[in-house]
Amino acid sequence: GRFHYGRRGSPTQWALAEALTELEPGADGTMLYPSGTAALAGALMSVLEPGDVLLVQDNVYEPTRSIGSSLLRRWGVETRFFDPEDFEAYAGMFDDRVKAVMLEVPGSLTMEVCDVPRLAGIAKEHGATVLIDNTWATGLGFPALEHGCDITITSLTKHAGGHSDLLMGCASAGKAHYAKLRHTAQLLGQYVSPDDAA
């Protein structure tokens, strides 16, 4: 069952995750994390292995850049940054090692809006998983899973909390990727307090 061990989820954690899944069109499940940055790291770690290449939009949230250029690099994952407006150059970056693309809309620092369906479509042509930091728009403003993304990540600190009384993040995905998110989170002990989820 779902309640056989605390780190596997409590009634409040499951209730929040299920509510967030309902707000994310196309999602089969949502994982909760202790922060938005933890959600970013956990999601990326669920789809990447040593030797892989990650393509990252060049105007993403600074911690996302750092996860790619430091943490993932130490694990043998190469990160390459791209201009989301230069589709030809972006398409030219793909090779057999590129396994994932990290998008963000709008860009955290610049509020630039990119053509997510087009970028995701190019990634899909090359068999890459598409992740998006959808914190500003959320699934209510931009249903990313319906526009070609595989995993959508949100900092709940900003929207679910917003009053400096909650620190949390989430990642939502379809069935196959949700299973990977859940497995990786369990191995890393990435969970939130049942009280915070209430």
Annotate the PLM regions.
Residues 29-198:
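Conserved PLP-enzyme active-site core in the AAT-like
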Residues 1-38, 64, 68-70:
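Conserved N-terminal alpha-helix of the aminotransferase class I/II PLP-enzyme fold
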